Curated annotation (Swiss-Prot):
This is DNA ligase. It comes from the Bacteria. GO terms for cellular component: cytosol. Keywords: DNA damage, DNA repair, DNA replication, Ligase, Magnesium, Manganese, Metal-binding, NAD, Zinc. The active site is at K116. Its EC number is 6.5.1.2. It holds the Pfam family DNA_ligase_OB. NAD(+) binds at D34, K35, T36, Y37, D38, S83, L84, E114, R137, E171, K315, K339.
Amino acid sequence: MSNQQIKEKIISLNNYLKHLNHLYYDLDAPEVDDKTYDSLYNELLELEAKYPSLVLEDSVTKIIGAFVSNKFKKTKHNKEMLSLDKAYKESEIFSFYENFTQYKNLENFGFSLEPKIDGLSISIHYDNGKFIKAITRGDGTTGEDVSENVFQIRDVPKQISYLKPLEVRGEIYMKKSTWKSLNEDIKNQYFQTNIEKIFSYMQALPKSKSWSNLKIKTPIFFKNARNAAAGTLRQKDPKIVKSRNLSSLFYEIVSPLEHNLKTQMEVLAFLKEQNFEVNEFQKLAKNDQEIMFEINEFSKIKNNFEFDCDGFVIKFNLIDKWEQIGFTSKFPKWAIAYKYMLEEANTKILNIVAQVGRTGNITYIAQFMPVELNNTTVQNATLHNYEFIKKNNINIGDEITIIKSGEIIPKVISIYKKNTDSVFEKVLNCPSCNSLLEIPEGYVDQFCRNENCDEKKIQMLTFFVSKNCLNITNLSVQNIRIFYNHPVIQMREIQDIFLLKNHVDEIKKIKFFAGKSQENKKINNILQSIEKAKDAYLRNVLAALGIKGIGNIAANLLTNKITKLSDLNNLTDEDLLSIDTFGEKSIENLKEFLSSEKNQDLIKFLDENLNYLNSKKSSKLNNLNFAITGSLSISRDEFKKIILDNGGIFSNSVSKNTSYLISNSKENSTKIKKALENNIKVITEEEFHNLLKEENA
């Protein structure tokens, strides 16, 4: 893949993971199972590690957890509730273990092992032996006070014998049998309610003369036990919480050394002594071989438990070393969660279709007999490009093995049973416009080169209004398709988006928008979003044009040399080559874009109709290029804003163009080593602020 394609992949994964986070943490309505999420997250991590210059500032890999709901009182945690780093392979467990071999007599205290419960993290406070309050994890720093609801859970102790102030942490979950009973109750209630409704309606039928007015809602079942637990814990009525029989398991005490608890195994024993529910399957392993043995042993029985379990938690047992071992911004370094392999399924291909994207690239999709993967029904999977189909000898009618992996839709990983004698025939023409497809030099993907291809243009418009570009929030791809295909509106070009206000009468006649005041509100929301988007940062507008190789980072660097889009025409090769990440290919792509009369018309239109916001507050750091490594006193996004606001250039990686590398750490990270090798000055956060003061003087 080209850099631009990789960048688009990273943006796509990041946006989708944000969407999943919102559903999972804030709405209690997960769209995918945890294994699918973990695989998506893992693919993003791998891409970021491989292409550090393409890491997004708002990457979900930098965020601890959920946003805080507004349903319950926000409460700050006394100590952050961090998540755990994850391992997927045996080799990653061995690497984790290597970090501790420096300690003498390691086998004497070893590692505690516990199953990873798929529930909702909770922190409960006790004082003088009494239950005081319960707080959800939230974003790791601030959670929700759900004390009244947690108090209804039967196995959560309301009184303990330990009298000192104590904070314990664990998981609230719903047993599998309880979840099944709850869904059965929902079904029975549904039938009972609607039988009565139908009976009453039948009695009135001679008057109504029609069944068309009888409206019966479809019952809403909980897809899995975690959904049921999440929906229950955030109920406004504590009586409902009590009736649904939630359960708990605890595994942590905050500041255990203050309670004279020296090992994690002692913590678990203390919790049990105080009548907290703890997992009975807890082990102590002396070394990496024993860790893997216990992980493999538990995998054989994990489905026999009443709780959902997707992993195994390994903690360095000796607590007084935890602070010394330390933390990242998201994880403790002394613990890790081993995640079990993703579930696979076999199914039969019913059809293979080709789809065209914004750049014209063709993706093949397999449509197959629906199968269940971790409580999710799937019936489509990506086949990537024709080379993948050819290499794996895939055709309609073959039986395949699929896995919910690092894609928004599942992946085909192999042929399970070959039922045909041939391979699927290569698509030669664009599925949208029927143009002959091409394979550019250096690529394996096929491309549609027709600039007027309808689907390409729809995808281009969708990209332009997306969050990382113009962020026109209410103009969905569904709306774009409607306006694009309308005989009068014909929203075919970017300029047409800003002329949509001239077609309000036509929009009101469209069935989707017609009649109701609610639908008129939809129209107003779209138009208001478009007007709001006219005040835009130049870097976002440039990125929204979709020029190959010029994503958000390159656009940000490029806009340091221009004040409007038309200034691009005046930049020399020398100007462009002085920009970090810009090479001959990027220059070629930019020149190709600017050579089009159609694109020049677009540039002129945007310059005349948009108000470019100036993000710079000063020029103190003009022509200085900064990179960052390690943790700082403020978030990386905030630090980046200071650099950009003062005219500096921010880059995710160290290169020959880097002026300073900012780091508070004395450790020799990869970035620090590269900076020193290239005679780039490494400065602390304090030295950076001193530099700002000097420039100001």
